[in-house]
Amino acid sequence: SFRNEGLSTRHNPEFTMLEYYEAFTSLSNTIEFTENMIKTASKKVNESEKIKWGDDEIDLGNFRQASLADLVLAENKDLTQDDIDKMDGMKLLELFENSVEDKLIQPTFVIGYPVEVSPLSRRNNDNPEIADRFELFIGGKEIANGFCELNDPDDQAERFSEQVKAKDTGDKEAMSFDEDYVIALEHGMPPAVGVGIGVDRLVMMITNQTSIRDVLLFPQLKS
């Protein structure tokens, strides 16, 4: 894969991505599959679920789940649950990235992402303000991103329209309106869950490397 982004010890414009999808399954089943796959990969290399990554001791035998809102609330003692409930989704995500993300050392599936920051994800049946989505963090780094695919063409068109408004107001990460995709959804798509894993970061973790350049065949990052 390619992204027009800068170089760092955690990012490279060219990187390896593993994506997998399954129809007629649940988010919880996909979370379990992802956890077992990572455990198996580590055991094959390290013969243990307890590994070292840089200065951190990581226990891959103990994955947990936590909601994004609860994690933000726990790290920001000046905020109340009412503050969180009233907060814009983009602001909540920004707080998470700035105050929580790098503290998620042990394997954590973060769930409960706001719909505003999940434009391709299906709404949760019990709470339509959040998406059926997870991100997996290990060692303070995002390893995987997965969600139930949004297969409602009307909802998807509405989400794209909101993304266009965000782009017009300066959001550089907002998406354009993909009319072809909406038309494809109108022809029908089964319920499905998809996951993307950054293979380079996963290899970094399993082999205890602290720079992405050490797991790339042709790194652009200088020593």
Segments and roles (model prediction):
Residues 1-29, 33-37, 63-223:
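A translation/RNA-centric and nucleic-acid-associated enzymatic feature enriched
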Residues 3-4, 56-58:
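Active-site-adjacent structural elements in folded domains
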Residues 38-45:
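A common structural junction motif
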Residues 46-57:
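Short, glycine/acidic-rich hinge or "gate" loops at secondary-structure transitions
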